[in-house]
């Protein structure tokens, strides 16, 4: 199977498509694992090898569990007391990516490399992967037991300091924060998560190669409640819920690294009870459920009577009754209004979040499209040279700055040029004459959740779909941009009608957007029209299927070359969500490569202020 790669913006471009680089977030996980798509044949061969060696293994919800042959501890005899109880002796193989992870010896390698260690005799030239005992050094050396004053500062009614100490909380008096340890599936400490009592801000610190979870509850429990922040974790963990463990996600609703999945394998039921504090996080539970196996996942939709745990406690609602009302994420083929009633009420009470992420640079789009929503298909078209890529760069940058994980597939221009355009739009002016500022802005820009496919030029559909499916699973990508669709035609084994081929490609992206709940934006060229004629939905190249499948159709109209007073504007020609159609004027700022009137007005204000003084 051909593996697809992603690059780290502005820092490294890898031309070998088999490599994948994970972006380094501020306060987000930095994975040392070489991530790749799993070849099903490798996985089948690996399981066959285990059967031939009579090695016990178990197919879990997301991982294959087996004895680690790379771990030094496993070369020593295992006592009867350890059998079946010591999770540190287990290794995990992710069934989607093929990542081989041992949380005990911190070995992370590909399935191909791990397969060699299970072969007898060992192949010639075989080298044992480097093992290192995960050791995490805390950034907070002055930790103490929680004091009554610290407990009172949380503002949770009825909470005692003894309860906080019992769930593993520690107090850092100098910075006025509560501290919790994060552990992996082997119960090894790999990081820490802290809550500043002053502004209720949370921060996470992890070791460079691991990612852990905060779990409270007995090891024999098979049900768990997943929450997104420490306040909700404290509320539920101190309520003595006998049937469920309480799990705090490490990165709130931004991403769920695959290194966290082994620690959740033992649970047969997972209930998402999340606090949705931003529009882009509204569908996070469904996205995480796809990664964790939908069949074991349930969901508590936020309503006035079923809010987040800390809000429910403040309103004196019965937490156990709310927990009992959790509904399956995966619905049956046929349902009733009664089954959907709570979902509908939740959407009506949270309509702004349901509308999607609002653009800050393009307020007109907010009025017409209402927001950027996951699971939709958008088509952007316009004449050659009209600025489709430049506009889409700023359009996607606006969303990425608000936490929308974005994957760019630029087949027309190289990633270095695209990344340079995005950086210039981010800064607002060119950096070629201010090179001393580059490191500062590059470091700021690198914090954005942006990923790039390393494909360039014509590409067949299969490896591109493999790449975006991998990105949606590993990096929790919410927005995929393909620029442009015509570069994916004419290179497949299909030798039929080109319009039928394009329809097949569009159908594949439509299916992907719906199945994986990811917004897909396709940049397409229009068919050749007379310059004086306006483009319409029927001007999109190919058959009518493209615009029929799309939820949104955006057309850049450029009349500057055909009329003295001609203008350039973006036309919303189709809007399936709200039905509102209209236009947005496009005025281009060359310095910042920006079409945003907000940015341009701010720039004029800055230029005007010194002259007035």
Swiss-Prot record:
First-tier enzyme category under EC: isomerase
Subunit structure, as described in the record: Homohexamer (via C-terminus) which assembled in a ring-like structure. Homoheptamer which assembled in a ring-like structure. Oligomerization is Mg(2+), nucleotide and DNA-independent, however, Mg(2+) and nucleotide stabilize the homohexameric form.
Annotated region (RNA polymerase domain (RPD)), positions in chain: 124-333
Catalytic activity: ATP + H2O = ADP + phosphate + H(+); Couples ATP hydrolysis with the unwinding of duplex DNA at the replication fork by translocating in the 5'-3' direction. This creates two antiparallel DNA single strands (ssDNA). The leading ssDNA polymer is the template for DNA polymerase III holoenzyme which synthesizes a continuous strand
Co-factor binding details: Binds 1 [2Fe-2S] cluster. Required for protein stability.
Effect of residue 102 to A: Loss of ion and sulfide binding and increased protein instability, retains DNA binding
Record annotation: effect of changing residue 297 to A: Does not affect ion and sulfide binding
Domain spans labelled SF4 helicase: 351-602
Protein name (Swiss-Prot/TrEMBL): Mitochondrial DNA helicase
Sites where the protein binds ATP: 382-389
């Amino acid at each position: 199977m051909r593996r697809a790669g992603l690059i780290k913006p502005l820092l490294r471009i890898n031309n070998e498509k088999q490599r994948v680089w994970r972006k380094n977030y501020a306060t987000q996980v930095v994975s040392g694992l070489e991530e790749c798509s799993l070849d099903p044949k490798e996985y089948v061969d690996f399981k066959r090898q285990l059967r031939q060696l009579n090695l016990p293994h178990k197919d879990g919800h997301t991982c294959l569990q087996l004895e680690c042959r790379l771990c030094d501890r496993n070369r020593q005899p295992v006592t009867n007391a350890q059998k079946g109880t010591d999770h540190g002796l287990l290794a995990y193989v992710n069934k989607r990516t093929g990542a081989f992870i041992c949380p005990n010896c911190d070995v992370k390698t590909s399935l191909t490399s791990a397969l060699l260690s299970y072969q007898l005799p060992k192949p010639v030239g075989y080298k044992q992967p480097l093992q290192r005992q995960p050791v995490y050094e805390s950034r907070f050396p002055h930790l103490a037991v929680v004091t009554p004053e610290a407990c009172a500062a949380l503002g949770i009614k009825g909470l005692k300091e003894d309860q906080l100490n019992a769930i593993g909380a520690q107090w850092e008096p100098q910075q006025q924060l509560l501290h919790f340890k994060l552990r992996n599936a082997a119960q090894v400490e790999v990081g820490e998560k802290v809550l500043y009592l002053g502004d209720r801000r949370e921060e996470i610190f992890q070791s460079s190669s691991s990612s852990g979870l905060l779990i409270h509850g007995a090891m024999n429990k098979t049900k768990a409640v997943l929450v997104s922040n420490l306040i909700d974790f404290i509320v539920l963990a101190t309520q003595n819920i006998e049937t469920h463990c309480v799990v705090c996600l490490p990165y709130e609703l931004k991403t769920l690294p695959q290194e966290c999945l082994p620690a959740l394998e033992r649970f047969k039921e997972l209930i998402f009870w999340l606090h949705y504090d931003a529009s882009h996080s509204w569908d996070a539970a469904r996205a995480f459920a796809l990664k964790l196996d939908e069949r074991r996942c349930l969901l508590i939709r936020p309503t006035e009577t079923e809010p987040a745990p800390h809000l429910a406690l403040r309103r004196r609602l019965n937490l156990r009754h709310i927990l009992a009302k959790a509904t399956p994420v995966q619905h049956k083929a046929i349902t009733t209004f009664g089954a959907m009633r709570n979902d509908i009420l939740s959407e009506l009470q949270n309509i702004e979040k349901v509308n999607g992420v609002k653009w800050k640079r393009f307020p007109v789009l907010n009025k017409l499209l209402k927001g950027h929503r996951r699971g939709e298909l958008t088509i952007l078209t316009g004449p050659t040279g009209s600025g489709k890529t430049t506009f889409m760069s700023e359009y996607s940058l606006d969303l990425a700055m608000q936490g929308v994980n974005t994957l760019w597939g630029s087949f027309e221009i190289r990633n270095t040029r695209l990344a340079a355009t995005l950086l210039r739009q981010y800064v607002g002016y060119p950096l070629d004459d201010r090179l001393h500022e580059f490191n500062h802005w590059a470091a700021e820009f690198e914090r954005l959740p942006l990923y790039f496919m390393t494909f360039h030029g014509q590409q067949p559909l299969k490896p591109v779909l493999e790449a975006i499916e991998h990105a949606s699973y590993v990096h929790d990508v919410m927005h995929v941009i393909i620029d442009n669709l015509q570069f994916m035609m004419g290179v497949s084994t299909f030798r039929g009608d080109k319009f039928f081929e394009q329809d097949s490609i569009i159908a594949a992206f439509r299916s992907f957007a719906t199945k994986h709940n990811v917004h897909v934006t396709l940049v397409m060229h229009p068919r050749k029209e007379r310059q004086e004629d306006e483009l319409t939905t029927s001007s999109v190249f190919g058959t009518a299927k493209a615009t029929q499948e799309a939820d949104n159709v955006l057309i850049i109209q450029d009349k500057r070359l055909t009329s003295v007073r001609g203008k350039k504007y973006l036309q919303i020609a189709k809007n399936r969500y709200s039905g509102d159609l209209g236009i947005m004027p496009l005025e281009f700022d060359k310095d910042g490569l920006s079409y945003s009137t907000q940015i341009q007005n701010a720039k004029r204000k800055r230029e005007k202020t010194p002259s007035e003084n």
